[in-house]
């Protein structure tokens, strides 16, 4: 196992990771509330932790990765009623859609994906413990609240002081007259007519949002585990409340390291459903190849805000295509190479970047340098060196989950573009006609064929190994 540094949101600085168990990392990431299709902000969280875990495993770490599913929630109930379907029908459909989207983005499945409704008993046990310890109290309306003033360290993750906060800091926190203090948050919601509920010591009801993650994470990973992650928007109140209720319940430190993925912005504003400026993953995949979306996410540091636009995705497509072109040029001459010999200097430079808080922009810069060296070696017919560069680049791009598709299929992908009026055979025939024209020194005729293909959306690229074609951007 190689040591690495990560930014701990609680300490507000980069620190060296020290595992609780040698060689092992327990990680919990807040997943989706499944009442709609995932948007591009969800994609960023899924992809970021996917490449982080891929890298850690490549470094010899044994990672146990848990990502939960919230399948009971006010929004889920509302949407199911609007659709005139059961909650189970709604959530099952969107869980399937979420998994399909994640797979297309190249994300491996988590080791476990617990659903909130499967842990109701564990949530009730945690709430009972909090009530018994005096950290929570039942209200007359059937709700149970966590008493924030009883937890002295409240605010340590977000850096907020209790006295400075305002009630209703999040749309997910209700202001109720039954609270002792306006910042107290609900652990158990008393049953309402025509809503799902479970029997409990406090009457029929259902869990609050925050208690779900505390119960699922501690049941899957234990009271005290290594890394908890999620989107930056969850820092407060969700993660702050998780810390309070978990530590008040168990008496142990909840998490050693907190990791938060930055916002995706649209026109300078955070992308969110509440602002109505969000794009579903499926919306974007209609216009761009899923791996282009993944590259767009990987190319920015996971903590940095990133601006979403068609221009940015087109730039991502152009950049990703450079790797595919390099592989195509090599494979046309030498075929696919499964050698194990790699360039250790490039690998170490890549690893150094990734060990520094998963610095993907720096890591990708190393990959582009390696890509240039591969192109040079192929051009200069340095077969042995080209093979080493090829195998090394294949290895490192795989760690980031990039360049994982068939080269020709990717280069000729028509996602988001009009269907070509020419077949592959017709394009190849025109390429041959152009080659014949050049051989006959009919350069104007050759140029005319190139332009005719370009007018049809086909770009030709002449290489030492022959002429390649791809779709125009």
UniProtKB/Swiss-Prot annotation:
Q: Which organism is it from?
A: Acinetobacter baylyi (strain ATCC 33305 / BD413 / ADP1)
In chain numbering, motif 'KMSKS' region lies across 270-274
The identity of this protein, by name, is: Cysteine--tRNA ligase
- Kindly list the cofactors needed: Zn(2+)
Gene Ontology terms, cellular component aspect?
Answer: cytosol
Organism classification: Bacteria, Pseudomonadati, Pseudomonadota, Gammaproteobacteria, Moraxellales
Q: Which NCBIfam families match?
A: cysS
What HAMAP family does this protein map onto? Cys_tRNA_synth
Amino acids binding ATP: 273
Supply the alphabetized keyword list.
Answer: Aminoacyl-tRNA synthetase, ATP-binding, Cytoplasm, Ligase, Metal-binding, Nucleotide-binding, Protein biosynthesis, Zinc
Reactions it catalyzes = tRNA(Cys) + L-cysteine + ATP = L-cysteinyl-tRNA(Cys) + AMP + diphosphate
Is Ligase set as a keyword in this record? yes
Under Enzyme Commission nomenclature, its number is 6.1.1.16
- Identify its protein family: Belongs to the class-I aminoacyl-tRNA synthetase family.
Q: Give the top-level enzyme category.
A: ligase
| Coarse class of the protein's main subcellular location | cytoplasm
Gene Ontology BP terms: cysteinyl-tRNA aminoacylation
């Amino acid at each position: 196992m190689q040591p690495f540094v990560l930014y701990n949101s609680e300490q507000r600085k980069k620190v060296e990771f020290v595992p609780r168990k040698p060689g092992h990392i327990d990680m919990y990431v807040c997943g989706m509330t499944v009442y709609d299709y995932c948007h591009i902000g969800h994609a960023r969280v899924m992809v970021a932790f996917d490449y982080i875990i891929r890298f850690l495993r490549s470094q010899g770490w044994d990672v146990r990765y848990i990502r939960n599913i919230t399948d009971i929630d006010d929004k889920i109930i509302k949407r199911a009623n609007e659709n005139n379907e059961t909650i189970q029908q709604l959530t099952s459909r969107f869980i399937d859609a979420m998994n399909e989207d994640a797979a297309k983005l190249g994300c491996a499945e988590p080791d476990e994906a617990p659903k909130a409704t499967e842990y109701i008993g564990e949530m009730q046990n945690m709430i009972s413990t909090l009530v018994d310890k005096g950290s929570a109290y039942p209200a007359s309306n059937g709700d149970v609240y966590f008493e924030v003033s009883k937890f002295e360290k409240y605010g340590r993750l977000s850096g907020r002081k209790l006295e400075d906060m305002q009630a209703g800091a999040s749309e997910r926190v209700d202001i109720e007259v039954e609270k002792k203090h306006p910042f107290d948050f609900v652990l158990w919601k008393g049953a309402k007519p025509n809503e799902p509920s479970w029997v409990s010591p406090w009457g029929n009801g259902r869990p609050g949002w925050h208690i779900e993650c505390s119960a699922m994470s501690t049941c899957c990973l234990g009271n005290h585990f290594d890394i908890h992650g999620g989107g930056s928007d969850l820092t407060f109140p969700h993660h702050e409340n998780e810390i309070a209720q978990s530590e008040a319940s168990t008496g142990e430190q909840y998490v050693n390291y907190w990791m938060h993925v930055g916002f995706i912005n649209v026109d300078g504003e955070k992308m969110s459903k509440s602002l109505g400026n969000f794009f579903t993953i499926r919306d974007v995949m209609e216009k761009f190849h899923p791996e282009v979306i993944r590259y767009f996410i990987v190319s920015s540091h996971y903590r940095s805000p990133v601006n979403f636009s068609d221009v940015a995705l087109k730039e991502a497509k152009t950049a990703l295509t450079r790797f595919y072109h390099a592989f195509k040029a090599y494979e046309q001459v030498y075929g696919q190479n499964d050698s194990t010999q790699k360039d250790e200097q490039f690998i170490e430079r890549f690893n150094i970047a990734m060990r520094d808080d998963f610095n993907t922009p720096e890591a990708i810069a190393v990959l582009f340098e390696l890509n240039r060296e591969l192109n040079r070696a192929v051009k200069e017919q340095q077969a042995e060196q080209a093979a080493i560069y090829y195998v090394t680049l294949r290895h490192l791009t795989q760690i980031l989950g990039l360049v994982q598709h068939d080269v020709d299929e990717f280069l000729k992908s028509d996602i988001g573009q009009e269907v070509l009026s020419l077949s592959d055979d017709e394009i190849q025939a025109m390429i041959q006609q152009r080659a014949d024209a050049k051989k006959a020194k009919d350069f104007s005729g050759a140029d005319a064929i190139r332009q005719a293909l370009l007018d049809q959306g086909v770009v030709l690229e002449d290489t030492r190994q022959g002429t390649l074609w791809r779709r125009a951007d």
